[in-house]
Amino acid sequence: FGGGSMLKQEKLDTILEIVNTKGTITVKEIMNRLDISDMTARRYLQELADKDLLVRVHGGAEKLRTGSLLNNERSNVEKQGLQTAEKQEIARFAGHMVEERETIFIGPGTTLEFFARELSIDNIRVVTNSLPVFLILNERKLTDLILIGGNYRSITGAFVGTLTLQDIASLQFSKAFVSCNGIKDQAIATFSEDEGESQKLALENANKKYLLADHSKFDKFDFFTFYNISDIDTIITDSKLSDQTLLSLSKQTKIIKSKP
């Protein structure tokens, strides 16, 4: 990267990307990568540390551990009011992807809760580690509904951890539907490492892998990368995604914009 050609925010994003990918970054590395002075590199690190995006250590910085980020994670209740029209749009379209007699996995997240409401087929088996998704489908009196337990994360309503992973590992799915908090370059990321691990395993055990994400998730990082875009079969997003982003992602996987 040439120093002059990048905006400050891009430089900060680059530092975050490196530290979140590698786990650590040094001042020297930043100076070489971004073509900036020692003083500027240290100032940028301090700015990111002040925003609780990384941890300053001697000579550089480290990636935040999950516990330190908890205050920045939005709860399910907070997320329910965000991009609701877009999430409904995605959910309606994704609902048509499910066929009778399939076994599908639905992960945690408000977009997937909208998706659960749109499922109109009763002759399917649904496996989920999301309590909100389970409750929505249970109201529908879906006959073949499996809730996977484990450690409960009340902030998102998801079950995670060793028990959850053991259960998912023993199952196979026709299709897995997951969501995320950020998509940037090749990376699909979420806030919680535990939630990311369970989604990753479900995707690996599925014949078809679907990512449901509204336009606000694109070109954004989050704490834990759990999957690569090119390994997803189809991304379903809303009509507000820019054509430029659509074109760029189309080179890596199939991406569908739903209609309002």
Listing of model-derived features with the role each one plays in the protein:
Residues 1-5:
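Short, Lys/Arg-enriched N-terminal segments with co-localized hydrophobic residues
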Residues 111-115, 218-221:
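Short glycine/serine/threonine-rich phosphate/pyrophosphate-binding segments
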Residues 7-10, 14-17, 27-29, 35, ...:
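Conserved phosphate- and dinucleotide-binding cores of soluble alpha/beta proteins
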Residues 7-10, 14-28, 32-33, 39, ...:
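HTH-adjacent hinge/linker in prokaryotic transcriptional regulators
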Residues 107-109:
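Glycine-rich beta-strand-to-loop/alpha-helix junction loops that act as flexible
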